[in-house]
């Protein structure tokens, strides 16, 4: 197995993606428990450092994956109209507080004149690669769009992400239910209002 062949679930078999130092994470979590006044050796917490290390290995698996590893399958389908995958569930981790944000991504593109497309599941995998790392939603949205532009060379790309951030829900301003919406448009979607509006109508279910 190479460092880029890690898949979600491998941690259950004791494997971890390249760059994840699980023993170091365990030591750090133990120190955090001590720092907040807890006893890391009591029942209920004694296995917590190891559990957190395994969870982090899964949550941050995208750090050792590259978009070219999933956008490898390209078909010559002679399809030149929009391709859109809606409601791709995503879970990520806010890099400011290391708490989750979650929601959905909508990813669309217009193939180039050669009609090259990729598998629909590849779009979901691409979202996962960038979601499974310390992130901010704005960068996540742009990274997905830029990766598609680079790998597929389509006429245009649109990515819209809607997410709820627990750093706003469970702490700070404490506004549960508030959602953040970000978008990234490239090529034809940036240049043509009509094309962009068509995509947004499809995303919002108006067509």
UniProtKB/Swiss-Prot annotation:
Q: Which GO terms describe its molecular function?
A: GTP binding; GTP cyclohydrolase I activity; zinc ion binding
Q: Which Pfam families match?
A: GTP_cyclohydroI
Highest taxon listed in the record's lineage: Bacteria
Q: Which GO terms describe its biological process?
A: one-carbon metabolic process; tetrahydrobiopterin biosynthetic process; tetrahydrofolate biosynthetic process
> According to the UniProt entry, what is the EC number of this protein?
3.5.4.16
Query: Which Gene Ontology cellular-component terms appear in the entry?
Result: cytoplasm
Its pathway is: Cofactor biosynthesis; 7,8-dihydroneopterin triphosphate biosynthesis; 7,8-dihydroneopterin triphosphate from GTP: step 1/1
- Residues that bind Zn(2+), according to the entry? 94, 97, 167
| InterPro entries reported in the protein's UniProt record | GTP-CH-I_C/QueF, GTP-CH-I_N, GTP_CycHdrlase_I, GTP_CycHdrlase_I_CS, GTP_CycHdrlase_I_dom
Which keywords appear in this protein's UniProt record, sorted alphabetically?
A: GTP-binding, Hydrolase, Metal-binding, Nucleotide-binding, One-carbon metabolism, Zinc
Q: Which reaction does it catalyse?
A: GTP + H2O = 7,8-dihydroneopterin 3'-triphosphate + formate + H(+)
Q: How does it assemble?
A: Toroid-shaped homodecamer, composed of two pentamers of five dimers.
What family does the entry list?
Answer: Belongs to the GTP cyclohydrolase I family.
Q: Which PANTHER family match?
A: GTP CYCLOHYDROLASE 1, GTP CYCLOHYDROLASE I
Q: What is this protein called?
A: GTP cyclohydrolase 1
Origin species, per record, is: Thermobifida fusca (strain YX)
């Amino acid at each position: 197995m190479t460092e880029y062949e890690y898949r979600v679930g491998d941690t259950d078999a004791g494997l971890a993606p390249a760059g994840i130092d699980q023993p170091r994470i365990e030591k750090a979590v133990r120190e955090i428990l001590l720092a907040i006044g807890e006893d890391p050796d009591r029942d209920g917490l004694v296995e917590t450092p190891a559990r957190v290390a395994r969870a982090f290995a899964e949550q941050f698996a995208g750090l050792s994956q590259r978009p070219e590893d999933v956008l490898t399958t390209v078909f010559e389908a002679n399809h030149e109209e929009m391709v859109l995958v809606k409601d791709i569930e995503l879970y990520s981790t806010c890099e400011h507080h290391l708490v989750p944000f979650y929601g959905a991504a909508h990813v669309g593109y217009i193939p180039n004149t050669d009609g090259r497309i990729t598998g629909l599941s590849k779009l979901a995998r691409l979202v996962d690669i960038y979601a499974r790392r310390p992130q901010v939603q704005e960068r996540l949205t742009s990274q997905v769009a830029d990766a598609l532009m680079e790998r597929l060379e389509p006429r245009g790309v649109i990515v819209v992400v809607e997410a709820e951030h627990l750093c706003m829900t469970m702490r700070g301003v404490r506004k549960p239910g508030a959602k953040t919406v970000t978008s990234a448009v490239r090529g034809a979607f940036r240049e043509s209002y009509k094309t962009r509006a068509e995509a947004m109508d499809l995303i919002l279910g108006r067509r």
